[in-house]
């Protein structure tokens, strides 16, 4: 079935990047549950995204599926939302709600008057739409998959 094939493809991709099988399994169950009513067959890959949103020091690849848009963020050393994406969005800080999973590298997310948090490989994260900033930590590219907020991020 389509949901099973989609989940298998997603599992293989994430498993090649993350070794925590419980987290990978949970993400795939989410996808399976979301698409259990689908009758048609859809398989997409980030190697051939529907859209690429490019900005200084990074890019955001988008694949569109019925009822869901999934994004893959790739940010390079020195990337910071308020410097690199803010000029494109017209807001000082990110106001997009996120649900995703860190694949590689590390990034900090910071809200005003709250302790910053670091997201790394294997972390399943939720970030509210309260204005926040984010930046790459270290020298490695930060890569994450986004299941919520992808339709409007950096658009």
Residue positions per predicted region:
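N-terminal amphipathic/basic-hydrophobic helices that include classical n-h-c signal peptides
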Residues: 1-37
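A short, N-terminal "cap"/entry segment at the start of jelly-roll beta-barrel domains
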Residues: 27, 31-74, 82
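Short, charged/polar surface micro-motifs in flexible loops or helix N-caps
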Residues: 68, 76-82, 104-107, 153
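Conserved short histidine dyad/triad with adjacent acidic residue
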Residues: 72-93
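Short, conserved beta-strand element in jelly-roll/cupin
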Residues: 92-108
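Short acidic-glycine-tyrosine-enriched beta hairpin
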Residues: 113-129
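Ligand-binding loop in jelly-roll beta-barrel domains
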Residues: 129-153
